[in-house]
A protein has these predicted regions:
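AAA+ P-loop NTPase catalytic core and its hallmark functional loops
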Residues: 1-164
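Alpha-helical lid/collar subdomain of P-loop NTPases
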Residues: 152-224
Length: 224
């Protein structure tokens, strides 16, 4: 999946796993692995000595499926923000469906997401990995987000605002200023959750509502 940050990549992949579960009538696993936060040991596992064989083996991470009859999705997010060592470990899973000799069960699918090339702090992927994937540009329209928001308990006031100001759903195109707060689909949902929890809708505490808006979706929107 190719998309801007905060567009809901992990949410839509998790939703797919839930739909698979309904279709199969059995449990379907879902693991969201944020590669930008991983070291190589977080992928390969921790080394330990197999006393019986005298060979060093790797203890697999919690997310590695061990049931051969299981189904699920391994979701590697922020693939193009991972370190080179982490990428090499992920390559083996993505290309060979194996990790240190352990086979990924046939019922599991591997999905990865990358942040758009126009965002900062991303690396160019090796062509050997790039051409092994089916690529999807994930860019739902603002109205598609509005439809999704209506079905996912997003505050009505937020939905109506985006319906009138569709250009303010996402951060602006181009280089973003470090340290500055911009709107994103993820931050709009977080803003919605916060104002509902604090009871700020139709509240006389308009100053507090403005401050919360600044913190989640940026100063420019907060003063509108």
């Amino acid at each position: 999946l190719h998309a801007k940050h905060g567009v809901g990549k992990s949410s839509v992949v998790k939703q797919v796993s839930e739909e698979m579960e309904n279709e199969l009538g059995k449990s379907v696993g879902f693991w969201d692995v944020r590669l930008s936060q991983c070291e190589v040991g977080d992928i390969k596992g921790m080394p330990h000595l197999d006393v019986d064989s005298g060979v060093t083996r790797f203890l697999k991470q919690e997310w590695w499926p061990t049931d051969e009859d299981s189904h699920g999705i391994l979701f590697f997010d922020e693939l193009n923000r991972a370190s080179k060592d982490v990428l090499q470990a992920v390559f083996e899973i993505c290309l060979d469906r194996r990790l240190d000799g352990k086979k990924l069960p046939d019922g599991w699918r591997v999905v990865a997401a990358v942040n758009s090339d126009d965002e900062y702090d991303v690396v160019e992927l090796d062509p050997a990995l790039h051409d092994r994937w089916f690529h999807i540009d994930f860019d739902p329209t603002p109205m598609e987000w509005v439809d999704w928001a209506r079905g996912n308990d997003v505050e009505t006031a937020c939905i109506e605002f985006i319906n009138r100001n569709q250009n303010l759903l996402d951060p602006p195109v181009g280089n973003l200023e470090a340290g500055r707060t911009y709107p994103s689909r993820r931050s709009w949902v977080a803003f919605s959750d916060t104002i509902k929890q604090m009871g700020l809708i139709d509240s006389p505490e308009s100053g507090m509502l403005t401050q919360v808006a600044k913190g989640w979706v940026g100063r420019e929107i907060a003063v509108m």
